[in-house]
Structures are given as C-alpha cells and as structure tokens.
Amino acid sequence: MGNTVAMILAGGQGTRLGVLTERIAKPAVPFGGKYRLIDFTLSNCVNSGIYRVGVLTQYRPHVLSKHIGIGRPWDLDRKDGGVEILPPYVGRHESDWYKGTANAVYQNLEFLEENDAELVLILSGDHVYAMNYNDLIDYHLLKEADGTIACMEVPIEEASRFGIMITDVDGRIVDFEEKPAKPRSNLASLGIYVFNYEFLKKVLIEDENDPNSSHDFGKDVIPRILRENLGSLYAFRFDGYWRDVGTLRSYWEANLELVLPVPPFNLYDPNWRFFTHTEEMPPAYVAPGSKVSTSLVSEGAEVYGNVFNSVIFQGVKIGRGTVVKNSVIMTRTEIGENCYLENVIIAENVKVGNNVRMGVGEDAESKLDPKVYSGLLTVVGMNSVIPDDMVIGKNCVIGIGVRPEDFKSKTLESGDYVIVREE
C-alpha cells in the first residue's frame, strides 16, 4: 500500500467548548473517564499499523505535548518512525503560526520527505471514533484516486456544520462545499483524508502561493481541486461510530453514551484497544451504603455517595450523602458531603464544598455567551473551588481558577457566571 505517514491536526482551540478549552487545546480535552480526545486518533493509527505520525500543534500545546511525550503508551517510541510533535516553525518569515489546515501540512512537507511518504493520511485530533484506516487506504488504492475523503450521512438539519460533498454513482466527488448555509446533500466530510504524496505536495505548494487562499483543506484546497479538475477525489463512506464533540452539549452527550446498556462506542473491544498516557492508580472504591447505577467510574475514584448515569474520571472523590446525576466529573475533582449535582460538567482538579447544590432551579439563557453555553448544562473550569452551601442554577459557568471569595453570594442564579480574567 506504500509508506503511509499520518498527520494529525491538533492545533484547534475549540472555542465552542468554552472554559474547557480556555487553557488547553481541544485535542487535549479529557473524555470517557481516563482519555484525552487525541488518544482515539493516535490509537486508530497504531491499531491500523501506522507508526509514522506527526502531531501538528499550535494553540496552548503544553498539556497536549506533555501527554503525548515520546509516544510510549501507543507503542510510538520507535527508532524507525514513531510520533513527532510539529509546532509552527518560529522564526520563518510570516510562519510563526499555522495559517490554516493546509498551511500546517505545507510547513511540514520536509517531515513527510524525511519519512519517505507515499501516502499521507490527514486526521483531526479532536473527534471520538474507531476506524481502521486500512479500509480507507484500500478503497483509495482500488479507485486509483489522487485523494479520498472519509464521509458519512448526517441529518440534513445538521449538514451546515460540515463540509458537504456530492458524488457520482461511482463515488467520485463532483462538488464540495464547506459548511454551506443551504446544503444540497447530507454527505458530510469527517475531516479524514488520504492523498498520494506527490499530488498533495503539488496542490499544497500551489495553494501556498495563492494570495486569495485561507490555506484550509475544506475551504480552499478541496474545492480548488474539483473546480480546476486537478485530480480525482473519491468519497469513502464510513458506517461506524464517529462523533464531533465540538460543543458542550455534544461533548456531554457523547460521554453519557458510554454508560448506555449497549453503548454505541465500545471502549472495551480487545481487538481495538484505546491507549492513553495515565498515572497508575488503585482500583475504584465504592463505600458501603453508596449506590452507583448506569455509570462509568474510573480507577482511583472513591465514591461515598450516590452516582447515577454519570462519567467519573480517575481520582475523583464523592462525599457521603452526595448525589451526582447525568454529569461528567473530571480527574482529581473532589466533591464534598451532602451535595446535589445534576447535568454538570466539572473540569480537572476542582474542589466542591459541602452542601452544594448545582444544576438546579429554573431554566435560563446564559448571560455569558448563549451560543456556547446552552442546553441547561452547568460547567465548571479547572482548578476552581466552590465554597460550602452554594446553590448554583442551570446553565451557569464557573471559570478557571475561581476561588470562594470570587462568589458575591451563596446563590448563583440560572444563566449567571463567575469568571476570573487572566491578568
């Protein structure tokens, strides 16, 4: 099949995830009890036998770079191949920042040359899915295509969120439009591409020299290939589980799908394991008299209260008399005694005091940003401390690093927020 090199686009900010991505890149956002989003793409690579991987970082890369390290959890700590972090080339003329997804790959053509790339797999580092990339590559080779895009049908009312394509009866793409206001199809790009390297190199150099381009695959490169008939592009239809968790609602829903009696996404398949960088922790502990129902509780967690339909990450502590429902509680968060939390997302290293009620009261629109904070979820940013006896309504936002003295009273009405700005 030729020498395949994977390029994982991992520089996205993920602004629609609000405080969850204020300090970390979207691919570094925790998911599913112990993972980070990029773990799924990295694991798909090694499960597909692809061991030459570049991770293109940009926005707040520290946590992501530390998480990946030399790639040992994914068996990518190799002398031949392996994983390499590829930040923008600081110091190069006008190149201190990747200008778009296509420019990010263009800036790393040298990396592809050094790895003798014949096929280039371009992937997003912030989606949740399991895919054998060999199926995509085999289809690409069968069609003798210059490029192939993985796609799936989506509800037509959601199609405007995606790159949308139209194909002929043979699967060849005849038209592509990025996030159209009035989509003419519901066949959506998954942001997963495979290209013949020499073809990709040619079109990226041409795109880089186009002053009118924003240097993005979906907005510029793919439409231009089709418009100017530069090569053949085919659509590979994927029928497995794939989720874009780019909004708080979709992130929350995808986590809670993991606790369904028959989850649509299987974390437990021994033939397709997902790997991550994690510290060793003891088994989870559920105290006598506590109740855990339809939930995922990760190692190191200590549950002294009651947990229903929730995802509890590693090292979380839940106090006596506390009830947690329909919630996502991230690593090393501690929740005190006699609390009630419903429909909340709490980031890492948060401390919630005793007798706190969160996610309660009347429905209300967010006063901070209704486009980001909706669906009546209350969200707490990392490293915050919620004082005892607080009552926090629905659709509230507690920012990063908030302290007890930042709360003006013991009640935060639905839709309200407490944010501490960085100096």
From Swiss-Prot:
Keyword tRNA-binding assigned to the entry: answer is: no
Gene Ontology terms describing biological process = glycogen biosynthetic process
Please list the GO terms describing molecular function.
Answer: ATP binding; glucose-1-phosphate adenylyltransferase activity
The pathway where this protein functions is:
Glycan biosynthesis; glycogen biosynthesis
**According to the UniProt record, what class of enzyme is this?**
transferase
Q: Which residues bind alpha-D-glucose 1-phosphate?
A: Y98, G163, E178, K179, S189
Supply the alphabetized keyword list.
ATP-binding, Carbohydrate metabolism, Glycogen biosynthesis, Glycogen metabolism, Nucleotide-binding, Nucleotidyltransferase, Transferase
Return the EC number: 2.7.7.27
Catalysed conversion reaction: alpha-D-glucose 1-phosphate + ATP + H(+) = ADP-alpha-D-glucose + diphosphate
List the CDD domains hit by this protein, alphabetically. Answer: ADP_Glucose_PP (cd02508), LbH_G1P_AT_C (cd04651)
The record's section on InterPro entries has:
ADP-Glc_PPase (IPR011831), ADP_Glu_pyroP_CS (IPR005836), GlgC_bac (IPR023049), GlmU/GlgC-like_hexapep (IPR056818), NTP_transferase_dom (IPR005835), Nucleotide-diphossugar_trans (IPR029044), Trimer_LpxA-like_sf (IPR011004)
Gene3D superfamilies assigned: Hexapeptide repeat proteins, Spore Coat Polysaccharide Biosynthesis Protein SpsA, Chain A
> Which superkingdom?
Bacteria
- Which Pfam families does the UniProt record give? Hexapep_GlmU (PF24894), NTP_transferase (PF00483)
> Its biological function?
Involved in the biosynthesis of ADP-glucose, a building block required for the elongation reactions to produce glycogen. Catalyzes the reaction between ATP and alpha-D-glucose 1-phosphate (G1P) to produce pyrophosphate and ADP-Glc.
Give the family this protein belongs to, as stated in its UniProt record: Belongs to the bacterial/plant glucose-1-phosphate adenylyltransferase family.
The annotated subunit structure for this chain is: Homotetramer.
The protein's name is Glucose-1-phosphate adenylyltransferase
Origin species:
Thermotoga sp. (strain RQ2)
